[in-house]
């Protein structure tokens, strides 16, 4: 509930930016949180990254306006990447487990994508080229792979 409240608060504030977070050198498990505010506030870009565990990596690139990206990682050796261009796009990646790999690429207008991985060794990729597309991938086992492309 606390994370959802924080997410909503930052969304309303419209924290802009591009964010990258890694936690390679933590001696113990901690919560690593990053919000970056590098671009103009008029773009209304938000990148929120939360990490618990070790050796997790998250990368977000945003070009456009009204973009929101949320990445949550718990475990070890998880990789997440979001690449957003265009306007009014939303991307969400949640990883629980180890050695999961997820990426979302969005362009155009009004797209929503979510990847939820619970297990180990999963791979998922969502690419959205069109307008007003929605895609959700849920992987609850280990060593699963999927690629979704929407035009």
UniProtKB/Swiss-Prot annotation:
Q: Entry's InterPro entries?
A: Curlin_rpt
Task: Supply the source organism for this entry.
Answer: Salmonella typhi
Q: What is the protein's major site of localization? A: other
May I ask which residue range the UniProt record assigns to the signal sequence? 1-21
Q: What functional role does this protein have? A: Curlin is the structural subunit of the curli. Curli are coiled surface structures that assemble preferentially at growth temperatures below 37 degrees Celsius. Curli can bind to fibronectin. The minor subunit is the nucleation component of curlin monomers.
Q: Which GO terms describe its biological process?
A: cell adhesion
Q: Which family does it belong to?
A: Belongs to the CsgA/CsgB family.
Q: What is this protein called?
A: Minor curlin subunit
Compartment(s) of residence: Fimbrium
Q: Which Gene Ontology terms of cellular component type are present?
A: pilus
Alphabetical UniProt keywords: Fimbrium, Signal
